Amino acid sequence: MKKMIALALAALMIMSVFAGCGSKEAAEEKDYSSMTLEELKPLVKTLNEGKLTMVTSPDFAPYEFYALNENGEPTLSGFDIALGHYIADALGLTLEVIPMDFDGTITELANKKADIGMAGYSPDPAREKVMSFSAVYYTGGQSFVTVNDKASQFTALGDINKADYQIGAQIGSIQAKLAKEHAPDADIVELSKVTDIIAELLSGKLDGAFIETVPAQAYAANYPELNLVLDVPYEAEGSVVGINKDNAALLAAVNLIIGQALEDGSMAQFVADANELAAGDKFEGLLDENGQVAE
């Protein structure tokens, strides 16, 4: 009997410890959302002390790309990059940007090798399994793009779904999901860079492609033969910051900073500046091993 009572008491103690831990964690999680930025800053932990490590895919103007100066020297630019610096500055950190292919950014966040990622992410439920989402900082749209010579073939979304069409989209993107949804019978060609999609469109290898509206408009400004023929409905339009999963303090801080950037007009200025730069000389893709524009 004594053994049974002792075991019962031990079980109750263990349950109370776990319940207490759960309550404490829940309280801490809840507390983050009620804290000010100044209260959060000392609680924010990053992979490298003093740095905010951000992954991005610089092939998506005006979000992220390389602006070229008169000597052809590339500078990482775009409103995602500007927002990244704004967030780092607000946290008292130095921004470290690591360029890579789009799907690589998701892998790095999933493996917790980056603090944040910005690459025109939409809040897709599948991605939420491997990263946390910030509040929406920019709302855009989705478009179906083709060349002028083929524009008359696409007057409605249903026109895209033909077996003899080759339809492009970026690997791992919302646009790839939309392509499969609206053109299941077509040959969906997923490419790692939007620049490759544009090149394939212009060369006639693709009949059309799903591209986010703002970057598509930037490409069309440089290549008049491109035509944004259709708006593509998507229920979760908007861009978010991807954040290292379970870093609740960083998530809460980023949300506060995004709210500040939207309120003080900084975000609108970042978008305006990026669109102006994107209309000039630029390179979209990864630089070579010497940090120069790849041939």
Q: Language-model segments: what does each one mean?
A:
Residues D89, T94-D159:
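Acidic, polar ligand-binding/catalytic clefts
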Residues M54, P58-A61, P74-D89, Y121, ...:
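Bilobed "Venus flytrap"/periplasmic-binding protein-like clamshell domains
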Residues A26-S34, K41-V44, I174-L191, L228-L230, ...:
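Ligand-binding clefts/hinges and TM-proximal coupling segments of bilobed small-molecule sensing domains
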Residues D103-G104, Y121-V130, K177-E181, L202-S203, ...:
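A ligand-binding cleft/hinge motif common to bilobed small-molecule-binding domains
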Residues E28-Y121:
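Extracytoplasmic small-molecule ligand-binding "clamshell" domains
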Residues F79, E96-E108, S152, V189-S203, ...:
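Short helix-initiation/N-cap motifs at beta->coil->alpha
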Residues P58, T139-T146, T213, Q217-I258, ...:
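Periplasmic-binding protein-like
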Residues G22-K24, E28-S34, I81-A90, N148-K150, ...:
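Extended ligand-binding regions for polar small-molecule ligands
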